[in-house]
């Protein structure tokens, strides 16, 4: 099984280009099922979850053509949904990726029927699908859960309705939003997720002919249309990848510019990096972080839905706090079981105490390289970051988690001066 070996001690310097957002491209690819003509998606990242989604679309009968493109242009995909003949998302594909549930709304709205296996993915808590089911039921769907499958049908077109989410759910908002686009009448979604990836999905749907207002706010209003046509959409840059590289620069005392970024989607993260002592400069599509010659200061944070601090950056900031000056307190309010990286960071010499959903991190003068194991996507990134500042070699096992959400991370870090390699 492949591993990544990081030799610590190098400050990162240079420029890195950010890939398309994992959490935007997956729902957007699923949204192509709503159209009755080919849809081109550009700035598509090379990720294992994207490959899985393409396999799922192909399993349903869609034709997917991939253009690898260039570094400047990025990768693009042309999805032709006109050949879709199946409305069942099988366990074999869904078990590896929770985002597979995002075909439920589009298939139901377009074909009046859908069967999707209960999802898998990272083992970081229950992440219930009830928000998806309740929202689609509000639009008139008949839904049951049998033999590990969510089975949904509708009698004719779905009907627009007002639905209030019990809790903020990003994928729940996306699934119900996609279904509402082809529903009859007006749908109002209250307590909707405000994440930039939801807004990007809405922008894609609008480009195909949908009528949506309020994406990026807690209240989204959808005027249903009878059909979506073809079109083109470029996926927004990945704010979590952006944040990960900025934290890497801050931890190593370096200076890095991230290009093809969207600074306005990262306010909470940039605020914490500034609090840690970094000097940050932004343009419309780039962020420069300068931490040369300085040790970061510990920061305390609480994860919460956007625009607050993102749970997907929690592990990276825990790694930063491991070598920062002072004590940082991290409260995780989104997912249970999202401190699984703590035991691995302890192996490197970190000083972390966990009390329920809170982790108290006391900065150490130094970490020491050791064999560690990735437990989920963002945990794997935190172990790489810790390895960048640890003495000696850190060997990270089970890096297949990493490939679900980071495109060519070892090449990108290597170009910034890190000593990092993938081994068979």
Curated annotation (Swiss-Prot):
InterPro entries: Enolpyruvate_Tfrase_dom, Enolpyruvate_Tfrase_sf, MurA_subfamily, RNA3'P_cycl/enolpyr_Trfase_a/b, UDP_GlcNAc_COvinyl_MurA. One of its GO terms (biological process) is UDP-N-acetylgalactosamine biosynthetic process. It catalyses: phosphoenolpyruvate + UDP-N-acetyl-alpha-D-glucosamine = UDP-N-acetyl-3-O-(1-carboxyvinyl)-alpha-D-glucosamine + phosphate. It comes from Xanthomonas axonopodis pv. citri (strain 306). The gene is murA. It is found in: Cytoplasm. The modification 2-(S-cysteinyl)pyruvic acid O-phosphothioketal is found at residue 122. The active site is at residue 122. Its EC number is 2.5.1.7. Cell wall formation. Adds enolpyruvyl to UDP-N-acetylglucosamine. SUPFAM superfamilies: EPT/RTPC-like. Belongs to the EPSP synthase family. MurA subfamily. Pathway: Cell wall biogenesis; peptidoglycan biosynthesis. The keyword Calcium does not apply. UDP-N-acetyl-alpha-D-glucosamine binds at residues 98, 127-131, 312, 334. Phosphoenolpyruvate binds at residues 22-23. GO terms for cellular component: cytoplasm. Disulfide bonds: none annotated. GO terms for molecular function: UDP-N-acetylglucosamine 1-carboxyvinyltransferase activity. The lineage of its organism: Bacteria, Pseudomonadati, Pseudomonadota, Gammaproteobacteria, Lysobacterales. It holds the Pfam family EPSP_synthase. Keywords: Cell cycle, Cell division, Cell shape, Cell wall biogenesis/degradation, Cytoplasm, Peptidoglycan synthesis, Pyruvate, Transferase. This is UDP-N-acetylglucosamine 1-carboxyvinyltransferase. The keyword Protein biosynthesis does not apply.
